Regions:
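C-terminal accessory helical subdomains adjacent to catalytic cores in phosphodiester-
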Residues: 17-34, 44-288
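Short, acidic loop-beta-alpha module within alpha/beta folds
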Residues: 2-23
Length: 288
């Protein structure tokens, strides 16, 4: 089984299922979708609550992420039909997580400095992007949207938007980013960017072939823009990355912090789904 863990239960699965339908993503095993329904720092706190306090070098060592998620879902009354299909952790060969950067200013609710928040995200990346769970291609990978999942439609003109590499927002924009996207985006709705979902979380496929072709072409542009932007963040070259090693999630975070957060208190707009597509789906197609 391959487990997908999404921060939210609306935009993320909608995008993933649209891309899978249009580009025929072929996964080697059955997929399971789970919605965490909380932010990346809640994920950190949840995992830490199961860690061994005596192990200061690697507090996440020996954490069974699947059992942690099951217990979290039960304790917080979250739907977990997908997780219920997993009887034993060893049944899952790969896990992919998609979360927002979601940095917040220090206030009465958040006591963590921006440096402490970045440190926690870096710890999660280190844990998820190096942990193996038992099989040859197995592992866990965390992908981060900057600043949020809605970054997938942050463009000002009809695609492709050649100015995409320069788009940034204030690092503390938080939930206001959604309204900013609505005001900024050339498309005022998502009709030509993704399909809708029904009440059963199933994709409502369009019978309009022209619409399907437009969505598909738009995502080819979005993929290209985000791959070039990731490479620009990491290497200062707005071009296709020479390899996936150039634009690892850790490299992206480190360069976001150094070049944007620390210098300008900004974050460069970047969406995680094209990076997952490039890093995993394209490679999987080559292997099959």
């Amino acid at each position: 089984m391959i487990l997908f863990i999404f921060e939210g239960k609306d935009a993320e699965p909608r995008l993933y299922k649209t891309l899978k339908e249009l580009f025929h993503f072929e996964l080697p095993e059955e997929e399971i979708l789970h919605y965490f329904c909380n932010n990346i720092f809640s994920l950190y706190n949840t995992i830490m609550s199961y860690s061994d306090d005596e192990n200061k070098n690697n507090p996440f060592e020996d954490i069974d992420i699947i059992n942690v998620l099951k217990e979290d879902a039960f304790a917080n009354h979250k739907k977990c039909e997908g997780l219920d299909k997993i009887k034993h952790s060893y049944e899952v060969s790969e896990i992919f997580l998609f979360f927002d950067y979601d940095i917040k200013p220090v206030d009465s609710f958040n006591k963590l400095s921006i440096e402490q928040q970045n440190e926690r995200i870096s710890m999660l990346l280190s844990f998820f992007n190096s942990t193996e769970i038992g099989t040859e291609r197995a592992g866990i990978k965390l992908f981060i949207n900057y600043p949020m999942i809605e970054s997938y439609r942050y463009f000002k003109c009809p695609l492709p938007d050649e100015n995409y590499k320069d788009y940034t927002v204030n690092v503390f924009i938080d939930g206001a980013f959604k309204q900013k996207v609505d005001d900024f985006c050339d498309y005022k709705n998502t009709k030509f960017l993704c399909y809708d979902m029904n009440k059963s979380d199933e994709l409502k496929k369009s019978k309009d072939e022209d619409r399907a072709n437009i969505i598909k072409q738009n995502w080819i542009f979005i993929k290209e823009m985000n791959l070039k932007k990731a490479n620009f963040i990491c290497t200062d070259s707005y071009s296709f990355p020479e390899s996936k090693e150039k634009i690892t999630q850790q490299n992206i975070l480190d360069n976001q912090i150094e070049k944007y957060v620390n210098r300008r208190k900004e974050i460069a707009i970047l969406n995680a789904f094209p990076l997952f597509w490039f890093e995993y789906i394209d490679e999987t197609k080559l292997l099959t």
